[in-house]
Amino acid sequence: MTSPADATTEVAVSQESVAMVTGAGRGIGAATAERLAAEGMAVIVVDRTEQDTRATVAAIRTAGGRARGIGCDVAVAQAVTAAVATAVEEFGRIDVLVNCAGINRDRLLLTMGDQEWDTVLDVNLGGTMRCSFAVGRHMRRQGHGRIINFSSVAARGNAGQTNYATAKGAIAGFTRTLAAELGPHGVTVNAIAPGFVATPMVDELAERLGGDRDSVMSEAAKSSAVGRIGTPEEIAATVVFVARPESGYLTGETVHVDGGRP
């Protein structure tokens, strides 16, 4: 059994550690990759294509960090297996996995087609499962690791997002169950549920609503106790906290970072 003293010596955020972040080409994923690199980790930047990873990789390297971009569609099992194999071959291990890849296809259920439903679940939930499976096997052999998934406050229910809310709600259950399975092997599994955050998705939402970015953010801020929306950097800071060795007693939880949304 691991003692409290042993827990503080686990490999997590350190200059010898390696993190893999999916959906890291923009938004929260990019901010997370850059923050982990700033903490001294080598970061495997994963997005749908290698080209999508280049801006984040360049930002990390410009700041003096270590990064490698890998193109991978998390909806394809073979692509995930290949990406993880490449990462392990090049870096030797993966200490932190951040499952940040996600999409939305918002539409009321009664007007939603099978493809819009299936695609959202396959990327958000299926991608989390595939990456956790591939990386979790390596972490189990290592005897340590952090898996950090992304749920959302939308899991509580949000009109026009039955597909997205279902996927994000399922991730919370997936997280708690996987934590029980991997805990005996020194691997913690947690999820982060952001509220409304200023990312490129805001522009996409504004376009769908026929409004502008500022008006969408202003309206969203009204539902927050702190009177504003969040930033990708604030979510990234939470990822770093969960990834730290000192957080080894935290597992199976979904951490809400939503500015006090009711």
UniProtKB/Swiss-Prot annotation:
> What does the record give as its pathway?
Antibiotic biosynthesis; novobiocin biosynthesis
Question: Binding of NADP(+): at which residues?
Answer: 23-26, 73-74, 164-168
Q: Does the keyword NADP apply?
A: yes
What effect on the protein does mutating residue 164 to F have, as reported in its record? 50-fold reduction in catalytic activity
EC top class, as a word:
oxidoreductase
Q: Which residues form the active site?
A: 164 (proton acceptor)
Subunit composition and interactions: Heterotetramer; the NovJ(2)K(2) heterotetramer is composed of subunits of 2 NovJ and 2 subunits of NovK.
Per the record, the similarity remark reads:
Belongs to the short-chain dehydrogenases/reductases (SDR) family.
Does this UniProt record's set of keywords contain Translocase?
no
UniProt entry keywords in alphabetical sequence: Antibiotic biosynthesis, NADP, Oxidoreductase
Please tell me where substrate binds in this chain: 152
> Which SUPFAM superfamilies does the UniProt entry name for this protein?
NAD(P)-binding Rossmann-fold domains
Gene Ontology MF annotations: oxidoreductase activity, acting on the CH-OH group of donors, NAD or NADP as acceptor
Q: Name one GO biological process term.
A: novobiocin biosynthetic process
Spans traversing the lipid bilayer: none
Q: What is this protein called?
A: Short-chain reductase protein NovJ
Q: Give the enzyme's EC designation.
A: 1.1.1.-
- What's the stated role of this polypeptide? Catalytic subunit of the NovJ(2)K(2) heterotetramer that catalyzes the NADPH-dependent reduction of the tyrosyl moiety of L-beta-OH-Tyr-S-NovH intermediate to yield the tethered beta-ketotyrosyl-S-NovH in the novobiocin biosynthesis pathway. Novobiocin is an aminocoumarin family antibiotic that targets bacterial DNA gyrases.
